[in-house]
Amino acid sequence: MGKIIGIDLGTTNSCVAVLDGDTPRILENAEGERTTASVIAYTDGETLVGQPAKRQAITNPQNTLFAIKRLIGRRFEDEEVQRDIEIMPYKIIKADNGDAWVEAKGQKMAAPQVSAEILKKMKKTAEDFLGEEVTGAVVTVPAYFNDAQRQATKDAGRIAGLDVKRIINEPTAAALAYGLDKKGGDRTIAVYDLGGGTFDISIIEIDNVDGEQTFEVLATNGDTHLGGEDFDNRLINFLVDEFKKEQGFDLKNDPLAMQRVKEAAEKAKIELSSAQQTDVNLPYVTADATGPKHMNIKVTRAKLESLVEDLVVRTLEPLKVALADADLTIDGITDVILVGGQTRMPMVQAKVAEFFGKEARRDVNPDEAVAMGAAVQGGVLAGDVKDVLLLDVTPLSFGIETMGGVMTKLIEKNTTIPTKADQTFSTAEDNQSAVTIHVLQGERKQASYNKSLGQFNLEGIQAAPRGMPQIEVTFDLDADGILNVSAKDKSTGKEQKITIQASGGLTDEEIEAMVQEAEANKDADKKFEELVTARNQADQMIHGTKKQIEEAGDDLPTDEKEKIEAAITALEGVKSGDDKEAIDAKTQELMQAAQKLMEIAQQKAQAQQGAQAGEQPKQEDDVVDAEFEEVK
């Protein structure tokens, strides 16, 4: 089995790691960075990912997509999506199936399709390091992701050409990275994960029994729409409001200006983690009839904290719930680990320390721990890591809708996965010949307040008084936290099974079409790369030949010179075009035309070498070799 890589597919940044021996190693991308910005830009004929995409965002805001993870597995009508529509510079649209999609360069795309571009870059980074093709991956998701979001993440992997061997929760992955080298006594750790777009808290018990380490998740909680992007947006809104007060101009109507403000706000937020004050200085941020407008606003750490305090406080309630679900008090927590870039904010660190009554550990890299843990799990699945057992849980309860619009739970939240549960139900009316199984995920008693995962019918039930037929419903939850459901009429043996796919989500046909499109683009990308290489070779050939013509001077016969210059002109005429074969052919013609030039250059070089050899001083005949004695 080949290497199974670990990928942290983040809202703001993504990261890839691989097991190197028995140690997880973070891999640098083509730009030499250990993390890759989760930004995708569509330009004329090219798709940019990471820093190159981020760099051109100011001039191309409508076609530069970021924070796509906030849309993955989401419905367009979701409250969180509607909030994002108001603040995102790019277009969020409603797909035919009701999902939240995006539009760039006139093309409509599903969130998994866009996320696949990031996964492709992670895959390529790993392949460049390993020198071989990579197909297997462990991909992390927020612990509080629901079934639809997990399924959509797997779909993204498939579109990127990856076989996602396992989906694991981000806090669990961080615990794996932290605990792998910690031998000794048992510990219970709290992983507080505040990333770019999501927040999770997991309580994890690490046991050492006879040399085997068991990582058991006791409870998890969180908010899949709370993260660094929300902190950024608070600061962006403050800057825009201040500018409006000073200049009487609303920047929200200017996408280019808003992109500059967004970048400046991100930078200011990061600076305020180490400084008490920073200046947001944007000359020529916009202009009107009176002339150019400049932004120059001082922001203090205290001001930023006042803008986001309620967001930080919002993370504390899930901590209380997770502790209660784990049947623990704060005294039972051995260590606190902070994961996610937003945990670098001093206020976040202070609030967490205040809650747990202890400082968080400083020996975990908040940006890299999750990918490292995913690589460890990849090693476990590949059989490279022994004596490590991971027991994760489902973050939310699963059930079905029963009479009166009630949700009846079959699998409770925080149940260790994989797991299986069944329950027998009956009909609500006399002589009922079919039942609809409506599958739900959530904690509310009223079915309509929970997430609908889909529904199916079991037909052909024998006529009988209500309450007599016995219908066995089985829920089978796999290690990725994805659900399979079956319903069986015990009297007839008739059975109906489905793998839960939310009422939205991508069909197998749609995923396959996207895989084919990705493959087609792969060929197009390869051809583009080959074209650029041919152009570069042509440029080098032209430059080198012109230089040799100068150096040859009068030694080059006029007719030869004219022949070479004609070949140069011919190559210059095609090198900027898109016909690689034409560029290669004209490059070859120039090489042949310049044959005489090569000969002259070679003759000159040989003559020069001969002259240098002739100038070397002759050894004098009367020089006597001295004898010497080694003194020991």
From Swiss-Prot:
The keyword Nucleus does not apply. The modification Phosphothreonine is found at residue 198. Keywords: ATP-binding, Chaperone, Nucleotide-binding, Phosphoprotein, Stress response. Residues 622-632 have a biased composition (Acidic residues). CDD domains: ASKHA_NBD_HSP70_DnaK-like (cd10234). Residues 601-632 are annotated as: Disordered. Pfam families: HSP70. One of its GO terms (molecular function) is unfolded protein binding. Transmembrane segments: none annotated. Residues 601-616 have a biased composition (Low complexity). Gene3D superfamilies: 1.20.1270.10, 3.30.420.40, Actin, Chain A, domain 4, Substrate Binding Domain Of DNAk, Chain A, domain 1. Disulfide bonds: none annotated. Induction: By stress conditions e.g. heat shock. InterPro entries: ATPase_NBD, Chaperone_DnaK, Heat_shock_70_CS, HSP70_C_sf, HSP70_peptide-bd_sf, Hsp_70_fam. Belongs to the heat shock protein 70 family. Acts as a chaperone. This is Chaperone protein DnaK 1. It comes from Aliivibrio fischeri (strain ATCC 700601 / ES114). The gene is dnaK1.
